[in-house]
Each structure stands twice: as C-alpha cells, then as structure tokens.
C-alpha cells in the first residue's frame, strides 16, 4: 500500500487546504471503496476512517515508535475495540501492519531522496528496533533496505545516463542541422 492520498515533504505546519484536500480525498475513497460497492459503511465509521487518515497522512503519528492501539485510540478520542474494528474492516489489516506500512513507505521516500543513512533509518521512521524495521521492510517491499537502496542508486544512475545520452544526441542533431 502506498501513501493513500498525499505525498508529503518535510513540513512544520499543515495548512487548512492540505487538511481539506485529504478529507475530500478520503470521502471520495470512502464512496468508491465502501459506499458504492454494497459494503456497509456507517457514517460514524467514515468519520473515524478520515480521522485515522488525517493522523497518519498529515500528523505522521506513525513516526512515534511507542504508538500503540491504546495510545492512538486516546489520541483520536475513541475506544480501542472500535478503532481496531475500523482499521481491520476498512484497511484490511491490523493497526500494527498499517503503521508499519506507513513507516516503510516513509523509509523508501527517505532512501530515494538520499536524506538518511541505513543506520538511522529505523529510528527516524518510527520503528522501535532495527530488526523490526528490517523484517517489516523485507515483508512489505520484498527485499532488504540495502538491496532497495542499491536498486534506487542504479535507477538514478541509469536515468542520468539516459538524460546525458538524449542531450548529447539532441546536441549532435542540432550541430548537423547547422552544418546543412
């Protein structure tokens, strides 16, 4: 699962526009996935669904390595059972899996941008331990973080080589036109 709605960059504050966009996107997602397909989606479930997304997408609560079902339920003012049921029903996983998915996607972003070393990555992404990070990353991505990083670096190098090749070809074609 990728980030559900918004790609984020490091920011210190969330604008009302970002919040509004997320909530509208969540409402559309709700309609497409649940309301229009005969799945019983209660209004109160929709409100909690949007609240969960807001806290994950905008507030990035998944970066807290001590975030638990109890702590998250207190944060969003609901009970643990109800939060667990909504996550299970509408995200098709449990809360731990959902948080780890967000953490791994965030780790992929940091690796892709070259903003973080592999050593500091587990802590920056909200994992309590390095082993939990490696296990979750491998399960979700299908390869180790080191292998993912190597693939990203190879892709970047390949993109650079293609860009240089295309630029050189374009330059040579332009020089040929000038000589004619």
Q: What positions do the PLM features span?
A:
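Membrane-proximal linker segments that couple transmembrane helices to downstream signaling/catalytic modules
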Residues: 5-112, 161-164
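Residues that mark the N-terminal boundary/hinge immediately upstream of a DNA-recognition element
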Residues: 68, 94, 117-118, 129, ...
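Short hydrophobic/aromatic patch on the recognition helix
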Residues: 83, 132-133, 137
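A secondary-structure capping/hinge motif
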Residues: 87-93, 136-148
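Hydrophobic positions on the alpha-helical face of helix-turn-helix-like DNA-binding modules
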Residues: 121-122
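Conserved small/polar residues in nucleotide/adenosyl-binding loops
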Residues: 166-176
């Amino acid at each position: 699962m990728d980030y559900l709605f918004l790609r984020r960059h490091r920011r210190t504050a969330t604008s009302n526009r970002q919040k509004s966009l997320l909530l509208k996107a969540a409402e559309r997602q709700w309609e497409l996935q649940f309301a229009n397909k005969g799945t019983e989606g209660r209004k109160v479930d929709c409100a909690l669904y949007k609240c969960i997304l807001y806290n994950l997408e905008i507030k990035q609560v998944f970066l807290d390595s001590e975030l638990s079902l109890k702590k998250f339920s207190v944060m969003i003012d609901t009970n643990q059972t109800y939060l667990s049921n909504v996550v299970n029903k509408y995200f098709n996983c449990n809360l731990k899996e959902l948080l780890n998915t967000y953490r791994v996607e965030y780790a992929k972003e940091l690796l892709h941008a070259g903003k973080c070393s592999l050593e500091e990555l587990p802590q920056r992404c909200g994992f309590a331990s390095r082993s939990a990070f490696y296990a979750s990353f491998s399960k979700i991505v299908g390869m180790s973080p080191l292998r993912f990083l190597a693939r990203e670096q190879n892709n970047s190098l390949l993109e650079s080589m293609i860009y240089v090749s295309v630029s050189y070809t374009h330059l040579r074609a332009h020089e040929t036109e000038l000589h004619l």
